[in-house]
Structures are given as structure tokens and as C-alpha cells.
Amino acid sequence: DALGITLVQGGFLLSMVQMAGMLVGVFAGLTADGIGLRRSVIAGQCIFALASLGGIWVGQAEHLLLLRAFEGLGFLLAVLPVPSLIRQLVSPERLALHLGFWGTYMATGTAIALFGGPLLMGLTGWQGLWGLLAVVSALMALWVWLQVPSERQRLGALAAATNPVPTESALARLRLTLTSAGPWRIAIVFSMYSSQWLAVIGFLPSVYAQAGLSSQTAGALTALASLVNVTGSIAAGRLLHRGVCSRHLLYLGFISMTLTAFLAFGPLTADAPVLRYLAVLLFSAIGGVIPGTLFSLAVHVAPNARTVSTTVGWMQQCSSAGQFLGPPLVAWVAGLAGGWQWTWTMTGAASLVGLLIASGVTLRRPDPMP
């Protein structure tokens, strides 16, 4: 409100951090594979810190949009290497569990921001919130540098010197990734999930504010809806660990999101706000099995171990495209309809595409690192 942002502009602001991912996600994955996983995470956190510092002095919506795009680059460098890094640090029998936990990062971060953001802005203003984010990002970069072993430490100095890992050119890794069916399928499936999840969760404060709820109440309800997504992702990791078929988990997630979105926004529940909110909670919670499943699949459908970050980068690129386009599209439909009652049609269409693509997902394990 302080910057005079319209609803559609708010949709783009919500998704602008995904601009970098939509344009260069796979290339950021190539960069992470090339410069080293740990270095990439540290660089991403440093970019977060710089972008947050810049946000303190933003005075126009256009400048904030540009800053969010720059922040998106840091997001890519920070998150794309993590599945591959987890694969190197965790024993194979516990890999699915840990990747399920990693799949909660977006929902957890969103919930923390929604719970703590309004409180901090009330105390320090939005400039103070940006400053705090800069400090947190800088501290996280320092923690990774101090606590996560480097590639040389993980491989062993002697082994790295006497038996160096063969390298492939970035172009070769890119070609290998984009000519394989597996990375394409999980990338499209992820985009169908992320587009509707961010659109629904991101606009819940506006939906509830229009219904007459206070900003604090709307923020708390939205934060809880975001946080329950964590349960689905963790459950996916545990179920995969026990041998449940990944394809069946994807089916469960998309079918549940379709049904619950209809209950949350359709005309049949217009006079049942409690039922609508319970449907939103189920939309997010059961839908959470999708990212938990996909992050686990990414390390298996990658053509080889040296293309895991590139595969995750391509998955993130398609996901970012969905997150960039989903919120503005839902806002546009809401503007035409004069309300949110047709939101379920957009989420239902995304789920249908996700189901069709997920039906062809097959599991293969990447070649081991030499």
C-alpha cells in the first residue's frame, strides 16, 4: 500500500523473485556444478544480503521489482546445489528422508515471513525488515562457510590429487540434461504444482482482507496454510523411504489440490468460511507431497551424478516460470470475475496437466561419481 501497488502488480511482485529462475535456472545449475556446490550456496546468500540492503532505500514499485529479480539470482545459486550437496553428505539409505525435509524450504520460509513479517514491520517499518533479512543472509553465508565441508574436504585431499574427478564441459552437461526425458517431466510437473500453490497461498492475505479480516489475522491464517505444506513434504520423504511409488504420491498430490481448491473457492462453500479454510489447509498439506517427491526424483532421473544440479536447475527454471505466471494469471481472472470464485478452475487445469505428465515419470539412478 505504501508504494501504491495494484493487485496485478502485487502478483508480479510476488513472483518477480522467480524471474531469474525462469530465464536462467538451468544455467545457474550449470554454474553451481562448475564452481562447486558450497561456493554456489555462499554466493547466493551473499546476493540475498546485498539485495536486502538495497531494499532499504527503495522508493518506487519499479525499483522493487528489479531488486526482486536480482534477489532471484541469489535464490537460484543458494538452492539449486542443495539436493546434490545432500546426496554427497547423506548415506544412500537416508537420502529420501533428507530430501523430503529439503522440500519444505519454500513453505517454511513463507510461513516464517508471514508470521514474523507483519510484527517486525509494525516495530521497525518495512525498511527494518529488509535490514534484518540482510543480516540473516550474511550470517547464513558465514555458517555455510564454517560448517559445510568443501568439495576437497569431502573427497579427501589425497584422493582429489591422485584420482581427480573427470570433468565435462558445461555445454555437454546441458545437452545431456535437456535431451533426457526425465528432467523434462519432473520440471513440467513441478511448474504445475508451484504455479497454483504460490497463487493460492500468496493471495490468501488479500482474499481474507477483502472478507473483512484484520491484516494480522489474515497473515496468521496464511502462515499456517503455508506451514502445513511442510507436513506433506516430510511425509513424502518418509513414504519414499518405505518404498511407496513416487508416481502414486504425485497422483495423490494433484488430485487433492484439485478437490480442495474447489472447496476453498467454489460457490458451493460460499457461506462456509471455516470449511473453506480447512480446504486451504488440506490443499497445502497434501499438495506438499509433490515437492518432496520431485526433489527426491531429481537426483535419480539426472543423466549422471555430474548433472544433478543442472537437472535441479532445469526443474527450478520451469517451476519459476509457473510461479512467475501463476499469481498474475489468477489475479487477472479474479479481476474479470469480480472475486476469487473461479480460482479453482486455474488450479484444476494445472493439476490436470501435472497428472498427465506424472503418469510418464520413471525412476532411474544416475551413474555414480567416479
Predicted features and spans:
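Residue-level signature of mid-helix packing/kink "hotspots" within the transmembrane helices
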Residues: Q18-V26, T110-A111, S226-V230, I234, ...
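Conserved MFS/SLC helix-loop-helix module at the cytosolic interface between two early adjacent transmembrane helices
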Residues: L23-G59
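Cytoplasmic membrane-interface "Motif A"-like loop-to-helix N-cap segments
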Residues: G34-G44, H241-S256
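Cytoplasmic helix-loop-helix junction between adjacent transmembrane helices
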Residues: L67-T108
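Helix-loop-helix hairpin linking two adjacent transmembrane segments in secondary transporters
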Residues: F101-P149
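Extracytoplasmic gate region of multi-pass secondary transporters
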Residues: G182-A223, V230-S233
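C-terminal transmembrane helical hairpin of 12-TM major facilitator-type secondary transporters
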Residues: S246-L294
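A late C-terminal transmembrane helix in Major Facilitator Superfamily
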Residues: A305-A337
